[in-house]
Amino acid sequence: MNLLRLFVGAAVALSVAACSLPGQPKRPVTHFILADAAAPASRAGAAKPATLLLHEMEAAPFQQDTRLIHSRAAGTRAHYQYAAWSEPAPRRLTWLLRQRLQAAGVFAAVAPLGAGVVGDYQLNTRLIDFY
């Protein structure tokens, strides 16, 4: 009986002591910025006298995170532990799309939906997959 108590006490002491041992240094998380690689093409013709309202890009909740997504097998998704976007991909892609549409000069103005601007057209987008 005393041997059992000694064994249990030693096991508890070792497990508590192991929690206080210095571990591996924590790896830093690398943050990436989604950027437009090509310069937006400007349109030579006159812009339509219309305003385009751009709705925030819809995406699945799993894609609304800043962590990068990867897939090791078909039908599976996971987040990288040490890599992240600087902001959620759907929000950044909406901003990049608005910049492209403004630079194209097709519309007199391109504004985000809900900005208090009266628009003639509305563009809704959805991010299906991004990994």
Give a label for each model feature.
Residues 20-90:
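A structural "domain/chain start" motif
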Residues 80-85, 98-99, 124:
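Short, surface-exposed, polar/charged, turn-prone segments marking secondary-structure boundaries
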Residues 6, 65-71, 98-100:
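Short hydrophobic/aromatic-rich motifs at helix boundaries and adjacent loops
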Residues 20-45, 99, 103-131:
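Surface-exposed short loop/turn segments
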